[in-house]
């Protein structure tokens, strides 16, 4: 048995049974994951040697016959924003992920759901569909100010496909000044469903607010 303590901000994980792979979110690639900071590798064997990426990545891990990962790579990563006009609002470019937090496999379509939990990476946290064969990314949802996406899940009932996800603590962790109606604040959790038939979104059901 072996392990490493070098991972930083390791978040959600999902299993791809068809391809025998794991996909996992690394919210911020830095610290002991880097190869250029020996002080961060004290007490380790420096097995992870990648460049820093504060926008984070989704990692792919290939499993052996014992279901142990033996090879890994960064599947897709966020890209730091260098545009002086927009980087103060979105520290990561908006056509790629920022600080991924949750992942979920869509086995039927060989696609991956990626949900963000970012403060400075994107002004509004996003949910993406990543197409594994082509690498194409499609942004399918965004959240209110100050909230994060969580708990994305895809399930099939009969001929219908459903995706559910949660919008957590709107206006709660940041951007409180943007709040207009108190009822829309972080005291609520927003549950949302997207209904898909034959790869097409045919309707988006309304929000269900549950006060906590």
What residues fall within each predicted segment?
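Sequence/structural signature of beta-propeller domains
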Residues: 1-212
């Amino acid at each position: 048995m072996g392990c490493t303590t070098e991972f930083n901000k390791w978040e959600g994980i999902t299993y791809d049974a068809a391809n025998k792979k794991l996909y996992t979110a690394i919210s911020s690639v830095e610290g002991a994951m880097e190869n250029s900071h020996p002080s961060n590798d004290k007490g380790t064997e420096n097995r992870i040697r990648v460049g820093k990426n504060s926008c984070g990545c989704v990692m792919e891990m290939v499993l052996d016959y014992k279901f142990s990962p033996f090879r890994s790579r960064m599947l897709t990563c966020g890209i730091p924003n260098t545009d002086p006009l927009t980087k103060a609002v979105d520290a990561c470019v908006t056509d790629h992920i920022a600080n991924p937090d949750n992942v979920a496999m869509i086995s039927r379509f060989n696609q991956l759901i990626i949900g963000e939990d970012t403060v400075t990476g994107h002004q509004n946290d996003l949910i993406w569909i990543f197409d594994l064969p082509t690498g194409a990314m499609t942004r399918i949802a965004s959240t209110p100010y100050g909230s994060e996406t969580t708990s994305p899940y895809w399930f099939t009932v009969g001929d219908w496909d459903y995706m559910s996800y949660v919008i957590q603590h709107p206006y709660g962790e940041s951007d409180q000044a943007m709040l207009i109606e108190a009822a829309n604040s972080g005291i609520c959790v927003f549950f949302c469903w997207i209904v898909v038939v034959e790869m097409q979104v045919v309707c988006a059901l309304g929000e269900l607010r549950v006060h906590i």
